[in-house]
Amino acid sequence: MSVLVITGTDTGVGKTVATAALACAARVAGIDVAVCKPVQTGTGPVGGTGDDDLVEIGRLAGVDALHPGWRYPDPLAPVAAAERAGAALPTRDELIGMVRAADAPGRLTLVEGAGGLLVELGQDAVTLRDVATELDAPVLVVVAPGLGTLNHTALTLESLAAQHVPCAGLVIGAWPAQPGAAEIDNRDTLARLAPVRAALPAGVGSVSPVDFERISATAFDPNWLAGLL
C-alpha cells in the first residue's frame, strides 16, 4: 500500500487545500492518486449547502478517484456531530477497510482526517493516529505559520513519535504574501522540527483550477512525490 495520512495542527490551517495541492501535484507528475475522507462533518442537511471537502479537492486538483465515508450535517467534532444526527460513528475495521478498498497497486492514496490527529473519528475512541498506525502509513502535518504554531506542531510530532508513526513532513497551509518576523522565524524553526514539504500561498484555494495546478506543481519536490510510492 502507498497510503499517506494528512492531518492538521488545528482547525482552519488549510488541511483540505493542502490535500488538494498534493493530489494535484501528484497527478501532474503522472501518479495515480486517490483521496479518501473517512469522516466529514458540517455537510448540512440533505439537499442543502454545507461543507464537502472531497468536492472541493476534486474541483481544485482535477482528481476523480474520490472516496467519501461517513458524513454528518453539523459542523462539530465527529462524536458530537454523530450524536446530534442520531447516527453511529464507523468502527475501526470500517475505517481501515475503506482506505484499503480505495488503494491499488501503483496508486498513492491520500487520507484526510477530520480536525487534528487525536480527534475521535470512530467508535471506541479510534483516532486518525490509530488509523495511520494500523495502515503503517506516514503522516503529513499541515501547520499554520503564525504565533502558536511551534507548540502545536511539536505536540503533534510528539504524539506521532509516541506511537512510532513516521512523520512525512510539514506543509504550511497558508503562507502570507507579506510575512512578518514571527512567520519568517517560525518557518526556519519548523524546518528544524521536520522537513517542510511546501508552503502554500494564503488564499490559493480561491484561485482558478488552472492557476491552482501551476502553483501546486511547483510547490512540492518531484523527487519527494516519487518517493511516496
Curated annotation (Swiss-Prot):
Tell me yes or no: is Ligase among this UniProt entry's keywords: yes
Q: Could you name the Gene Ontology cellular component terms for this entry?
A: cytosol
Localization of this protein: Cytoplasm
- Just give the chief location class: cytoplasm
Residue positions annotated to bind Mg(2+) are 16, 53, 112
What does the record give as cofactor? Mg(2+)
Q: In which pathway does it act?
A: Cofactor biosynthesis; biotin biosynthesis; biotin from 7,8-diaminononanoate: step 1/2
Q: Which InterPro entries match?
A: DTB_synth_BioD, P-loop_NTPase
The residues that the entry says bind ATP are 12-17, 53, 112-115, 201-203
Catalytic activity entry:
(7R,8S)-7,8-diammoniononanoate + CO2 + ATP = (4R,5S)-dethiobiotin + ADP + phosphate + 3 H(+)
Keyword Transport recorded: no
| Role noted for this protein | Catalyzes a mechanistically unusual reaction, the ATP-dependent insertion of CO2 between the N7 and N8 nitrogen atoms of 7,8-diaminopelargonic acid (DAPA, also called 7,8-diammoniononanoate) to form a ureido ring.
Q: What is the name listed in the Swiss-Prot or TrEMBL entry for this protein?
A: ATP-dependent dethiobiotin synthetase BioD
What is the organism of origin for this protein? Answer: Mycobacterium sp. (strain KMS)
- Name the lineage: Bacteria, Bacillati, Actinomycetota, Actinomycetes, Mycobacteriales
Gene symbol?
bioD
